[in-house]
Amino acid sequence: MLTKVNKMSKALPASPVKNKILHAPKTLFAKTRTSKQALILFTRLPIAGKTKTRLIPYLGKKGARDIHLALLQDFAKLYRNFHRREKEVKLFLFFSSATAHEVVEGAFDLGIKKDIAEMKMLRNLFPDAEFVPQEGEDIFLKMKNAFLYTFQEGYSFSYLVGADIPFLSEDSFCKVFSAGRSGKNVLGESLDGGYYGIGLQSRVKSSELDKIFSLGKKREDFKVNPEQNRLMKPECAEREKQEQEADIFEYTKTALYATGLPLLLLKKRRDIDDREDIIAYRQLIPYNKALQDSFIGREILRQAKISIIIPCYKEGDTLSKMEEELRPYKKQAEILFADGGENHFSGEYKVVSCPKGRAKQMNTAAKVASGDILFFLHCDSILPKGFLEEIREALRKTPVACFGIRFSPSTPLMMICSFISNHRVYDRKVMFGDQGIFLGRELFFQMGGFPDIPLMEDYQFSLNLKKCGIPMGLCKKRLITSERRFSGSFFHKLSIMWKMNRLRARYRKGEDINALAKEYRDIR
């Protein structure tokens, strides 16, 4: 039978029928129906290596565990807010752990100390919840037993949900329990063909409850005896085959309709199980305020790997300075130098050999990079302190961004130039390469990378983003860049700035980019 977890500091008596699956009478508690409602949170203990295992190849054991913990923190906040509106709804936390019973019974040997520590963490997150270990041979039987437990406790409606759906809300919970009070069952479809939430009335018959949670057993029986369908009548065998191959949501929906009770279908939502889910939510963060402010939104960005891509050509001493500057960040980010030729590297960084041309170099290195975020940096730049955190913070609010710049040395003319460049991001929605452009790798490749042109690839890339309506951001911190393009006297610098302005204007009017590139090389 299922056992309650009350005080973690005291040993509880062992269950007399340990691991036994609960069984319901023919009609579930019809005579003792009450108006009490239960919210069942189904989860694992947040232990590294034992939770979110499909994320481990991507994020590692600790990273996967931290994703799970962030989801639990969001759920705890959601429940606190919801409970202020629906004080009569009781929270049950059904947890899964390899040593669940030992934790329940207070066994404090070395093998389960970690489980106990994580249980205490959950206790702090959910102080009002009743903790119960999951029981059953598969996930379906575990869910069935959780419902039986709450029904036997006198609850007329119970809603079971996982913590791995970022967009659950107070309003959605209120809608669910309103449906529960009106006698409806509830089912919420997840994007992968399963379901993220299921609500049941206690008056569901025992045979109907068995059917709702029987898919796991059907599939297991078929694995053990794949020839069993041949022994059935053709029409029965075909129906059995369809049920075995049905996705979990459709199978469960059919079983719920068969109860004869009205069914509320909730909005389809995406849970977080694998790398594709993390990528999808990371792309959504800049467009969703709730996700920006959530624990899971911040955790997804915190774990995003950054690849720093530096295009180089005839850099000389500038290259060694950049290598030295990046040395403290070797373990925090992937660093790739896109070598266009005639450079001398120290050998401590990854070098990608590319045909000469800044666009070609950056695109080639981007294909090799493994990061979730691509940061394109000019070799003559000096990075601000905390630039990696600044990048993640900027991408929390916009899908693509850059740093503000200032020139070294900072003369009055160059201060004006940097002001115009920084303001241009807001005013004209244009970023230049010397500002350090960064964005998610998916967006970069969706945009086709930098246009393969000999000049103004950064300018055209910005125009492409602008045309697609993609918002841009500007970091508060400033990146220092050299004024090597603007050598000479005050008037010579001014003439170069003016000529560059005219080159962009002529490019917008459709003049040949190769001819313009020759004029630009004359300037350099």
Predicted segments — roles?
Residues 158, 374:
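Short aromatic/hydrophobic "clamp" motif used to bind/position activated sugar donors
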Residues 140-146, 353-369:
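Glycine-rich, basic loop-to-helix element that forms the pyrophosphate-binding segment
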Residues 273, 455-461:
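Acidic donor-binding loop at a coil-to-helix junction in glycosyltransferase catalytic cores
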Residues 256-264, 453, 463-480:
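Catalytic donor-sugar/metal-binding loop of nucleotide-sugar-dependent glycosyltransferases
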Residues 47-80, 314-329:
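Short, well-formed alpha-helical segments that are part of the catalytic scaffolds
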Residues 90-97, 310, 322-327, 331-342, ...:
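Short beta-strand/loop segment that forms part of the nucleotide-sugar
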Residues 163-176, 379-393, 463:
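Acidic donor-binding/catalytic loop of UDP-sugar-dependent glycosyltransferases
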Residues 180-185, 386-413:
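Conserved donor NDP-sugar-binding/catalytic core segment of glycosyltransferases
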